[in-house]
């Protein structure tokens, strides 16, 4: 082991009368024979011829030129030789920056400070470096819409082997909304992104960038969710079930094709019918503002009579008695010169001439109005009346006591009975006139002989 503290008293000094080894070395060597070398060190091994009782362990001693101390009595020595050279092997400064540079960039958790503290009590201090806080990694944005689809790289897109198409779905209010089936996964992902932006705003988790859908969102910003989903389905290649090339047609497992209108169109049809019936007070499925065009068209067509009743009038005559069938006095038959009336065929007969039961002496008009127009054909009807009186003279009721013989029918065509048989669908029973009683035969029948 090397003893670097050579200026201290060694055991050899006691054997030479208290003189140090450096002093003896100076006295033995002359000034002319001593060679001074700067920057180099010489070492000499001295085998001392000590006494027999001296310690045998003292074998050799190392001497360093940098620790040589010149004698003050020698005046011929140079100033460089007389001056003591002091070199500190360990820095005294408290900071260990120099040692850290020497050690390099090797990092150690704990290291011992070997420098001497002259101010303090000289205790060895264990310095623990302050740990540098590790950089906090950026938090990865956690998806709020669940994991990605296993069958597709895009969110909200699923491939179905049965149909062979890519279908897009989105969750809204706890329900899965079908957006349509597409031939490619890219088209299905586009449909999902549009629906996600419409439902959840610009913070939605989408497959592509938000700038790709700016123009699309401007066009559909006034549409509701149901209307927007209906548009996306219209852009798809069909419905999820079946493989029909026609829109709205579905193939079921039983092998039958079914035509569907969908809830959206059904609600629209109901709302339009309710508005046409109840106007602005109607209760609709969608907002009333979306049917503003229907309301305006209804107000323009308010003067149109949608009554399905049959009217034969050409003018705007008011309804009479709330009936759907109107028969005004100026009918088509009246314009042709035919008067729809029934005259009493027995106006000129004597009192004792019987009249048929149910005959009337008043003219019958279908509209119930008082006749104010005389037909020119009335004269011809009066001439025919005299002929009819001769034909009807043999008609009458059988007097009591006479045999019930079949009377011969008058020659010529028989007139049809007037209101004798009710219509089959009218629901009224057939009307059959009954002969008057005996008390009402005065003036109509002869007395018994």
Swiss-Prot record:
This is Ethylene-responsive transcription factor RAP2-7. PANTHER family: AP2-LIKE ETHYLENE-RESPONSIVE TRANSCRIPTION FACTOR, ETHYLENE-RESPONSIVE TRANSCRIPTION FACTOR RAP2-7. It comes from Arabidopsis thaliana. Residues 408-418 have a biased composition (Pro residues). Residues 7-20, 27-46 have a biased composition (Polar residues). GO terms for molecular function: DNA binding; DNA-binding transcription factor activity. GO terms for cellular component: nucleus. Residues 153-209, 243-292 bind DNA. SUPFAM superfamilies: DNA-binding domain. The keyword Disulfide bond does not apply. SMART domains: AP2 (SM00380). Belongs to the AP2/ERF transcription factor family. AP2 subfamily. It holds the Pfam family AP2. It comes from the Eukaryota. Probably acts as a transcriptional activator. Binds to the GCC-box pathogenesis-related promoter element. May be involved in the regulation of gene expression by stress factors and by components of stress signal transduction pathways. Regulates negatively the transition to flowering time and confers flowering time delay. Induction: Repressed by miR172a-2/EAT.
């Amino acid at each position: 082991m090397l003893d670097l503290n050579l200026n201290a008293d060694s055991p050899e000094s006691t054997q030479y009368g208290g003189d140090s080894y450096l002093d003896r070395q100076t006295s033995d060597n002359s000034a002319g024979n001593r060679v001074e070398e700067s920057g180099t060190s010489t070492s000499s091994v001295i085998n001392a011829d000590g006494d027999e009782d001296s310690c045998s362990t003292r074998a050799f001693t190392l001497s360093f030129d940098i620790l040589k101390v010149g004698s003050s009595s020698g005046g011929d020595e140079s100033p460089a030789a007389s001056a003591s050279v002091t070199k500190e092997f360990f820095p005294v400064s408290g900071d260990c920056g120099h040692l850290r540079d020497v050690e390099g960039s090797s990092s150690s958790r704990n290291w011992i400070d070997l420098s001497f503290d002259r101010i303090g009590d000289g205790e060895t201090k264990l310095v623990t470096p302050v740990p540098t806080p590790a950089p906090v990694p950026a938090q990865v944005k956690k998806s709020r819409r669940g994991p990605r689809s296993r069958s597709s790289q895009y969110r909200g897109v699923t491939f179905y082997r049965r149909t062979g198409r890519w279908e897009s779905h989105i969750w809204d209010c706890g329900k899965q909304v079908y957006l349509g089936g597409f031939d490619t996964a890219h088209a299905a992902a586009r449909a999902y992104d549009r629906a996600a932006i419409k439902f959840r705003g610009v913070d939605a988790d989408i497959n592509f960038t938000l700038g790709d859908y700016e123009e699309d969102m401007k066009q559909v910003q006034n549409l509701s969710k149901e209307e927007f989903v209906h548009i996306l389905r219209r852009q798809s290649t069909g419905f999820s079930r079946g493989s029909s090339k026609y829109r709205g047609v579905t193939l079921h497992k039983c092998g039958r094709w079914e035509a569907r209108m969908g809830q959206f169109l059904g609600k629209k049809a109901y709302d339009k019918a309710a508005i046409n019936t109840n106007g602005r007070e109607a209760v609709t499925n969608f907002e009333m503002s979306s049917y503003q065009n229907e309301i305006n068209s209804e107000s323009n067509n308010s003067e149109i009579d949608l009554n399905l009743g049959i009217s034969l009038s050409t003018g705007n005559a008011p309804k009479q008695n709330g009936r759907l069938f109107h028969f005004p006095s100026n009918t088509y038959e009246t314009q042709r010169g035919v008067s729809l009336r029934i005259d009493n065929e027995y106006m000129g007969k004597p009192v004792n001439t019987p009249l048929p039961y149910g005959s009337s002496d008043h003219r019958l008009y279908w509209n119930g109005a008082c006749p104010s127009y005389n037909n020119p054909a009335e004269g011809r009807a009066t001439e025919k009346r005299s002929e009819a009186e001769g034909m009807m003279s043999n008609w009458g009721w059988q007097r009591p006591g006479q045999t019930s013989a079949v009377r011969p029918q008058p020659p010529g065509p028989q007139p049809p009975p007037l209101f004798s048989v009710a219509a089959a669908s009218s629901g009224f029973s057939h009307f059959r006139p009954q002969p008057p009683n005996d008390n009402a035969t005065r003036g109509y029948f002869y007395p018994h002989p």
